[in-house]
């Protein structure tokens, strides 16, 4: 797909959600309902079908490099954000924890899937799903650690909930099935068609949910930390991914998808973590809005570099 087309499709679908909120068709709290439909129904269908169609057992070990690199990128960026916030900006714990989260965790699923699908087709989406597994584990382990270490809700944990996260479970089970030679033609056609219908809802619902969740009002909390987070998300993270891909010999489409996925804006999940652990919500909200807005330019740039 033409790079600019990818950006315009993403923008239009996000704006559908945003203007649905502006005109009172939907409310911001409806984003949670859409998210539940995506997480529990549509996205698992997409993950199962995409991995089953586009991944062979001989590719699995090569593809498993992708979540490892994404996880290491999150870890490295998190350490740098900690050093910057702690020793340069002298931030208090709540603000420091928020900065680490928005710098470290990228939106590899809710934005990464549509972008990878638009740029690289279903084969690219299959690789993006593997990348997102690394993002999920980073959220479970690193994100929870940051919340406990720098937040106030120290007795709370999302580890159990994340361990039951349907896309994660579906991804792991799909990989296991493919490894043992499972084929989609083993499934009755009416079930496959049903899964395809459910899967087709994933991208538009994700984008509409994103549009409902975005709020320009967050800019009143300041843009500085959003710019800092953008530097980490759009420069440091992909530079780290590129370096690691060279070291462990990731090439071709895997490398291209990895670079795009490592450049995703701050994850919406950071707001959940920030609320749960009582971190600086204003910093997190403004950073999500700013990095998501900038990401449209970054997506267009990656498309121009990788597809031309």
Curated annotation (Swiss-Prot):
- Where does it localize? Cell membrane
Q: Which InterPro entries match?
A: Auxin_eff_plant, Mem_transp_PIN-like, Na+/solute_symporter_sf
Please verify whether the record's keywords include Lipid metabolism.
Answer: no
State which residue ranges cross the membrane: 6-26, 31-51, 63-83, 100-120, 128-148, 162-182, 195-215, 221-241, 257-277, 287-307
The superkingdom listed in its UniProt entry is Archaea
Coiled-coil region list: none
Entry GO terms, CC = plasma membrane
Q: Which UniProt keywords apply?
A: Cell membrane, Membrane, Transmembrane, Transmembrane helix, Transport
GO biological process entries: transmembrane transport
The membrane-topology field of this record reads: Multi-pass membrane protein
Protein name (record): Uncharacterized transporter MJ1031
């Amino acid at each position: 797909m033409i790079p600019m087309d990818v950006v315009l499709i993403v923008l239009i679908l996000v704006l559908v959600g945003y203007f649905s909120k502006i005109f009172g068709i939907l409310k911001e709290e409806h984003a949670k309902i859409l998210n539940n439909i995506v997480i529990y129904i549509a996205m698992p269908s997409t993950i199962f079908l995409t991995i089953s169609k586009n991944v062979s057992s001989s590719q699995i070990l090569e593809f498993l490099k992708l979540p490892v690199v994404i996880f290491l990128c999150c870890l490295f960026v998190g350490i740098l954000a900690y050093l910057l916030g702690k020793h340069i900006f002298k931030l208090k714990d709540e603000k420091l924890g928020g900065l680490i989260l928005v710098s470290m965790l990228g939106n590899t699923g809710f934005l990464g899937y549509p972008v990878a699908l638009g740029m690289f087709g279903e084969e690219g989406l299959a690789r993006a799903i593997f990348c997102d597994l690394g993002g999920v584990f980073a959220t479970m382990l690193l994100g929870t650690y940051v919340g406990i270490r720098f937040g106030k809700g120290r007795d709370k944990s999302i580890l159990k909930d994340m361990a039951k996260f349907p896309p994660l479970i579906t991804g792991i089970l799909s990989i296991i099935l493919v490894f043992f030679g499972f084929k989609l033609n083993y499934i009755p056609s009416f079930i496959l068609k049903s899964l395809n219908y459910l899967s087709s809802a994933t991208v538009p619902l994700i984008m509409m949910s994103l549009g409902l969740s975005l709020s320009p009002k967050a800019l009143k909390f300041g843009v500085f930390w959003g710019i800092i987070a953008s530097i980490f998300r759009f420069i440091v993270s992909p530079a780290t991914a590129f370096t690691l891909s060279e070291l462990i010999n990731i090439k071709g489409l895997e490398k291209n998808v990895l670079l795009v996925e490592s450049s995703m804006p701050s994850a919406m999940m950071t707001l959940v973590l920030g609320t749960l652990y009582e971190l600086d919500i204003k910093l997190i909200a403004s950073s999500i809005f700013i990095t998501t807005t900038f990401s449209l330019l970054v997506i267009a740039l990656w498309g121009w570099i990788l597809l031309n």
